[in-house]
């Protein structure tokens, strides 16, 4: 969330929140956190208090930490399933923030808060007459490594969206997590406000947390965690080999092949197909997640000037298949999918 909108790898203030839960810790059981008290709280760089906001019993989270505070629900755990919660933010004007008001729910988090993924809301952005700011109403981050700034610069408007939400009032949130995909639904809508297909973290399960921003008041109530059957996803798939790639972009479809080799975290290889022949690929691998780049040749007959262009791919490999996002700088954006070529 802008220079102080969200974290840049700086340690978060973490609060370990102990609450009563229904069948807490039992795999396959629903966990309910009413959040009407703060018994057993260990607060660091954040403060939790029982409160009423607009007549609803809740927990109020405040923090003076520049990059916000996180409260982990003790005993919570989810791989795949849904998280529901009521949340609200009392907006103030932290220094340097153009549109104040941040609050969110973290998932698949480490108990110490050192790694997590999160959807967060920015209700005042939804009221802006600047469409660019309106498109930042709901955002996704994965920390460490994939904060708002990096995701927005590398993949504009893919990890954030507009939503019809209001500041200083309760919002009902539901997050659906399935494998490497997560969706957020707001205020009972059956249509997601944001879909992240290709979650950035290799954490496949973890705790649920509450997040608030410096200088503001975030309120949380009625967290309900409902597990579902886990998707058959695993980490560590190798990218090495030959892959047949299909790229569905806003400039039309493209096809090609990648021949990749891997040495530790380093990936090299070649691309051949619609965007050029024997183009040198370079990039990185982490637990099956790759970020690759190669110099492309933009063809005649497509929107945009023909000629040299830079192509970028990111995504996950899962044994015999792979998928993610791809862009050709200044020319096209979309999703790619690949199948391993069997010789």
Language-model regions, residue ranges each:
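N-terminal secretory signal peptides that target proteins for export/translocation
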Residues: 1-8
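Generic C-terminal helix-cap and adjacent flexible tail
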Residues: 4, 229, 341-343
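Short stretches within intrinsically disordered, low-complexity N-terminal or propeptide regions
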Residues: 5, 23-25, 48, 73, ...
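Intrinsically disordered, low-complexity proline-rich regions
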Residues: 8-12, 98, 288
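Bacterial N-terminal signal peptides
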Residues: 9-21
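Extracellular glycan-recognition regions
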Residues: 26-238
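Central antiparallel beta-sheet cores of small beta-barrel/beta-sandwich binding domains
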Residues: 234-343
């Amino acid at each position: 969330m802008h220079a102080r909108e969200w974290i840049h790898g700086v340690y978060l203030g973490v609060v370990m929140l102990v609450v009563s839960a229904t069948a807490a810790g039992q795999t396959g059981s629903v966990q309910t956190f009413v959040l009407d008290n703060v018994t057993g709280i260990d607060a660091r760089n954040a403060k939790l208090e029982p409160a009423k906001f607009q007549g609803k019993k809740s927990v109020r989270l405040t923090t003076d930490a520049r990059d916000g505070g996180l409260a982990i629900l003790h005993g919570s755990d989810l791989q795949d399933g849904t998280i529901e919660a009521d949340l609200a933010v009392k907006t103030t004007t932290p220094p340097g923030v153009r549109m104040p008001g941040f609050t969110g729910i973290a998932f698949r988090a480490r108990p110490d808060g050192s790694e997590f993924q999160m959807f967060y809301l920015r209700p005042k952005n939804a009221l802006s007459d600047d469409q660019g700011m309106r498109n930042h109403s709901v955002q996704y981050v994965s920390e460490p490594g994939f904060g708002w700034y990096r995701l927005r610069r590398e993949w504009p408007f893919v990890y954030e969206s507009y939503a019809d939400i209001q500041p200083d009032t309760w919002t009902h949130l539901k997050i659906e997590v399935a494998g490497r995909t997560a969706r957020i639904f707001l205020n009972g809508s059956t249509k997601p406000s944001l879909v992240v297909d290709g979650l950035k973290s290799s954490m496949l399960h973890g705790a649920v947390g509450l997040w608030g921003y410096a200088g503001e008041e975030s309120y949380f109530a009625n967290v309900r965690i409902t597990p579902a059957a886990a998707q058959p996803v695993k980490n560590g798939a190798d990218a090495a080999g030959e892959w047949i790639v299909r790229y569905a972009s806003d400039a039309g479809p493209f096809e090609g092949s990648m021949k990749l080799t891997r040495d530790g975290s380093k990936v090299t290889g070649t691309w051949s197909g619609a965007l050029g022949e024997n183009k040198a690929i370079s990039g990185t691998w982490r637990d099956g997640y790759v970020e690759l780049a190669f110099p492309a040749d933009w063809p005649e007959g497509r929107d945009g000037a023909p000629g040299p262009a830079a192509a970028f791919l990111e995504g996950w490999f899962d044994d015999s298949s792979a998928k993610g996002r791809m862009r050709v700088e200044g020319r096209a954006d979309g999703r790619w999918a690949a199948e391993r070529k069997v010789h």
